[in-house]
Amino acid sequence: MYLKIVLLKARALGALSRALGKGNGVMVAGRFILKFAPNAVEKLAANKRVVLISGTNGKSTTSKLIAEALRTKYSIAHNHTGANLFAGVAAALGANPDAEVAVLEVDELVLPWAIEKTKPELVVLLNLGRDQLDRLSEVRIVSNKWRSAISADTSKNLSVLASTDDPFVVYSAVRPAEPRPLLQRQR
């Protein structure tokens, strides 16, 4: 019951933000959810099939394609605005708490947290680029964090779809004890 009240207030806060011309309301709603229901992401993701998409480039396009394809059969929670940090994930899940599937674009640095909190069935890894080194530090560090998060998932339900064009992504995607097949683009 408490979570439902938090979600209603978050929606109202988002609507107020839009009405006042202070943005689209997604981030303020997500921050509100995380502040007043810190375990909301876990609770909202628990009854959903979750797909996470991450990489330096192509997250928004890929997540929109996946969401639209799945929308033909399922109700979808999706961060269609591109809000891919912690608050954006919370807001997307909170905006459609009864969705059957969550398709979530997540920032490269947020992916380990998102894997832990949402227990996804599928993680799509696109690429890791050096275009934001001021924020990402070093691509190898991000790749190691991805690999650790993927390896830490012991559910056996997690599948990883990874671009084999990027050696850092390949390294991230393969669990040391359990190599998985990867798809490679035909040339």
Task: Describe each model-derived feature in a short phrase.
Residues K48, L125, G129-R187:
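Acidic, Mg2+-coordinating active-site environments of NTP-dependent enzymes
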Residues M1-L52, E68, T72, N84-A92:
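Short, basic phosphate-binding NTP loop
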Residues L65-T72, E121-D131:
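Gly-rich Lys/Arg/Thr-decorated short loops/hinges at beta-loop-alpha junctions or inter-strand turns
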Residues V51-I66:
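Glycine-rich phosphate-binding P-loop
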Residues Y74-T81:
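Conserved RecA-like helicase motor-core motifs
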Residues A90-N127:
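Conserved nucleotide-sensing/catalytic segment adjacent to the nucleotide-binding pocket
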Residues A45-R49, K73-Y74, P97-E100, K119-L122, ...:
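Short coil/turn connectors at secondary-structure junctions
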Residues L85-A87, V110-P112, F168:
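Short, well-ordered alpha-helical microsegments
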